[in-house]
């Protein structure tokens, strides 16, 4: 029976698969106004007189419809992805638009962060320093929509974030609905730029742009959290990926300058954009001083790493120093200009560490603390979860910094290698950072598809994306502590991923349909162009 069902899912006509995604997206948009991150005062249901859909038995029924909607979106995505991976079909702009467009009409989903964004914008607009005071310093209509945990918390974001929020709230005033609509437009525009940049990176590196956009941008995790949740990571990654694309496409020096400036703008939005800058330097080094011998591949043996370290020629060393200092200077200049133009202070630097209130097992420190608290409390009743986390977080943060350096040292042979390294670096932050949320994974996911060649890796990443899409409910509460939920979702999603993506006929590689001619010009020291 499973084989019959699997064959029907795998061979589903593309038009039907896309239609299921559209139905799921429309249904999710409708459900968001009942079971999403709804407003405490006002909102669509109150305006329509349907407030009874926001509580009681009807609320429970809408929750079921919300999960059905997400499952339809996941099924549509994986079936279309199977046709891209196995048959080399194109993703197509119309398919992407069909999946995303209905969510323009959705309310905030899976997080209340958008209300904090608007509140922080009003702080900047009304002359408050959001790095010194929280939402409670400027009470008003928006204050009541901010999550209680964050009403006295300063913002961890950069001056560009506050500048955007200030501009939006100057236009919309204290109208929450209008502010959300403008943020939704910004999210959609950033999403489009991200898709364009990821497709361009894939072409430059000889990969399939359709696979890259499908796995890195169009996946349900991104669509739900970037468009439904309107998180500023979508704008940050649009700037980062556009910067990396310019670093590959423009002449080496200009590419480094333009790319560093855009990544600097990303840093002014959220500091984690900085992790991509060292790998832009490796792109510059490879294009100016030549690539190192060997295959640009994610897996690297220890002896290969040691051999690469010994092959640090004077030309590469000089190019690296010039490129590193130059990129850092341009990036810093970009941040300085944005900080000055926005009228913000440098207080955001002290807030980079962000908050530590969020506890979930996506962060290794929180996961280990959850396992250790019971046995340790048997030894000493005075040992609590918070004490264990306080000890583990500095350790994992130190390991994260070490991991970032290791990624930079290992993946440096050429442009594709640099993208592998950037992906690995962002993945390290998603595991070892003190606080991790599902949309943080969109940074490594956005870059993953531009270099991947192994079908097994695509299956695993697709599976993780689908599972992660099912871990947060509409209001932002997580299901990561519901073991039965994770087991059932994990098993079903693994069966779905392997059914749609696996093709035993051609082994583990993605096939010739994904091997495109690379377009990255690599110049040696004597300016001899090579590929």
Go through the PLM ranges and name each one:
Residues 203-209, 298-321, 405-422, 454-458, ...:
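Membrane-interface helix-loop-helix junctions at transmembrane boundaries of multi-pass membrane enzymes
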Residues 72-81, 181-205, 238, 402-407:
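Transmembrane-helix motifs of polytopic, lipid-linked glycan transferases
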Residues 452-531:
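Aromatic-enriched
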Residues 1-27, 47-105, 414, 419, ...:
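Start-transfer (signal-anchor) and selected internal transmembrane alpha helices
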């Amino acid at each position: 029976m499973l084989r019959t069902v699997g064959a029907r899912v795998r061979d589903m006509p593309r038009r039907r698969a896309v239609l299921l995604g559209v139905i799921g997206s429309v249904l999710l948009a409708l459900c968001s106004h009942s079971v999403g991150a709804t407003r405490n005062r006002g909102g669509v249901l109150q305006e329509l007189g349907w407030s009874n859909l926001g509580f009681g038995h009807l609320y429970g029924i809408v929750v079921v419809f919300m999960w059905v909607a997400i499952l339809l979106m996941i099924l549509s995505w994986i079936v279309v992805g199977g046709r891209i991976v196995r048959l080399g079909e194109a993703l197509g702009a119309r398919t992407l638009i069909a999946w995303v467009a209905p969510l323009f009409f959705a309310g905030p989903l899976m997080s209340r962060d958008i209300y904090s964004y608007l509140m922080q914008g009003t702080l900047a607009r009304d002359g408050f320093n959001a790095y010194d005071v929280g939402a409670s310093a400027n009470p008003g209509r928006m204050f009541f929509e901010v999550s209680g945990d964050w009403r006295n918390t300063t913002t961890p974001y950069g001056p560009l974030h506050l500048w955007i929020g200030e501009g939006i709230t100057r236009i919309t005033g204290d109208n929450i609905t209008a502010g959300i609509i403008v943020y939704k437009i910004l999210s959609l525009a950033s999403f489009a730029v991200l898709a364009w940049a990821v497709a361009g990176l894939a072409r430059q590196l000889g990969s399939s742009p359709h696979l890259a956009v499908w796995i890195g941008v169009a996946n349900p995790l991104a669509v739900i959290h970037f468009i439904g949740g309107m998180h500023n990571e979508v704008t940050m990654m649009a700037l980062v990926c556009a910067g990396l694309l310019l670093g590959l496409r423009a002449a080496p020096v200009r590419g480094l300058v333009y790319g560093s400036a855009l990544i600097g703008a990303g840093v002014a939005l959220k500091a984690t954009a900085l992790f991509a800058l060292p790998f832009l330097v490796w792109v510059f080094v490879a294009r100016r001083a030549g690539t190192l011998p060997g295959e640009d591949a994610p897996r690297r043996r220890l002896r290969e790493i040691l051999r690469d370290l010994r092959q640090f020629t004077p030309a590469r060393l000089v190019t690296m120093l010039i490129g590193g200092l130059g990129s850092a200077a341009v990036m810093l200049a970009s941040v300085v200009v944005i900080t000055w133009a926005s009228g913000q202070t440098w207080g955001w630097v002290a807030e980079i560490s962000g908050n530590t209130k969020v506890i979930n097992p996506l962060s290794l420190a929180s996961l280990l603390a959850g396992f250790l608290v019971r046995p340790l409390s048997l030894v000493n009743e005075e040992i609590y979860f918070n004490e264990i986390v306080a000890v583990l977080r500095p350790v994992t943060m130190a390991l994260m910094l070490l991991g970032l350096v290791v990624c930079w040292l290992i993946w440096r042979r050429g442009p594709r290698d640099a993208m592998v390294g950037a992906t690995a670096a962002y993945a390290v932050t998603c595991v070892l950072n003190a606080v991790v949320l599902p949309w943080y994974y969109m940074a490594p996911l956005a870059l993953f598809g531009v270099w991947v060649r192994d079908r097994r890796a695509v299956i695993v990443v697709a599976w993780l994306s689908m599972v992660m899409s099912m871990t947060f409910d509409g209001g932002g509460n997580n299901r990561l502590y519901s073991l039965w939920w994770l087991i059932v979702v994990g098993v079903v999603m693994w069966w779905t991923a392997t059914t749609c993506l696996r093709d035993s006929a051609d082994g583990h590689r993605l096939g010739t349909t994904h091997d495109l001619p690379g377009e990255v010009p690599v110049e040696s020291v004597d300016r001899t162009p090579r590929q």
